[in-house]
Regions:
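Negatively charged, low-complexity tracts enriched in Asp/Glu with abundant Ser/Thr
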Residues: 2-58
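Amphipathic protein-protein interaction modules
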Residues: 47-104
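Extended charged/polar low-complexity repeat regions
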Residues: 106-109
Length: 117
């Protein structure tokens, strides 16, 4: 399967965008923000997602600096923690297996990007 996401690079950082990923529902910029703000280089995120996919745990709740991810076997919902103060940032829903692929791609790119700085 060809990946439909893209990386946008700046001098000191990069982001992952999902404009062409039809399987991501809702505000796709929420997924972008979650990766950039909360996942960053934390490979443990993959372990939490794997545990849910493999049914080691029924679901998981990942609370970060600005986002909450509700990981379930089929779908994961990501919400901005301050939705009440900034209602323009809406939640998004991602198939959990796809989220695993996205997080892995993000972490690999993150490592390569900052290793080359």
């Amino acid at each position: 399967m060809e990946n439909k996401w893209k990386f946008n690079f700046r001098d000191d950082y990069f982001v992952m965008v999902f404009d062409e990923v039809k399987e991501v529902y809702g505000d796709k910029s929420t997924l972008t923000g979650w990766l950039f703000t909360d996942v960053r280089d934390f490979r443990g995120t993959l372990g939490y997602i794997d545990d849910v996919i493999s049914e080691k745990t029924k679901e998981d709740f990942l609370s970060g600096n600005a986002y909450n991810a509700y990981v379930k076997k089929d779908f994961t919902e990501i919400h901005f923690q301050f939705e009440d103060e900034n209602p323009s940032i809406k939640p998004c829903t991602v198939p959990t297996k796809l989220l695993h692929e996205i997080v892995k791609a993000w972490l690999d790119e993150y490592e390569e990007f900052y290793d080359n700085k």
